[in-house]
């Protein structure tokens, strides 16, 4: 798993603990200039032999470059079967078994999987205690922090040439076949854990994008919008509007826009008690959903084989077309040669006819 972090001391330890318990073998983390204790937490996992830490104090929020670099380390140094491209506030949740089980069940023909995210809302009031015990109200349908459709996250089999796009939402430079959206994985997302944490994140990320003078306007547009709210003095109002108090909770539950979700809290409490956590499915039919998803994957694989057969047939037709084109070009050249010869012949006959007519005229007129 890759992690790009900056000042995430309130969550990064829980993130690494959780994913290691779920079957992740190794963590490659880039610490982008942290000064809040994040570096010390990461170094402890490095000393334990389950992580590699890269310190990067470079300017700009060049997420794609830094994550792609970690992916190459995972491919060449760790010989990883799969790489989860993760952020500190994201927890990959398997609906059945653990993460190792889910990734091991994906047929070899698929090289990447896109996973939906589910946002958890902040609590109104205090911020005492672990975030996973406080943030238990999940949106039934999530959008990002400025109201746009929440983009999925991507995990993939490492291969040469892969570039992880900004935000870890997609891949570039590869034709890895993607697993269709299934119901075996989701990402639990905790972007707003306190107002202080949220404000710090908005400022450091937004200013990081400002330092990227070659940045496309579409890259980081949501973070830049939040930075503008901060500079206009409206970020606190925005945060409070999303925080869940008793009234908002009651309305959200009645309208089915909010769900009480204690899965991560239960998992982490069990983990800290020394017991082996057991993943609780999101619904009693999770195993049936897994079978249904795997059936869909098999159907896609069959379709892929049919497409390959059609491509082979198309290549045969293309070869026939190429041969016919060559014959047509050859015939065209022959026609052009014949046309030129005919033109020369006609010109020659015209010259001979003109000469013969002149001689007759001279004889008739007595001229030579």
PLM features: residue spans?
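Short alpha-helix within the catalytic core of nucleotide-sugar-dependent glycosyltransferases
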Residues: 13-17, 39-43, 93-107
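Short, acidic, metal-binding catalytic loop of nucleotide-sugar glycosyltransferases
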Residues: 17-25
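Active-site-proximal specificity loops/subdomain of glycosyltransferases
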Residues: 39-83
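Catalytic-site signature of metal-activated, phosphate-bearing donor transferases
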Residues: 65-67, 94-288
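Short beta-strand-to-loop acidic/aromatic patch adjacent to the donor-nucleotide binding site
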Residues: 79-93
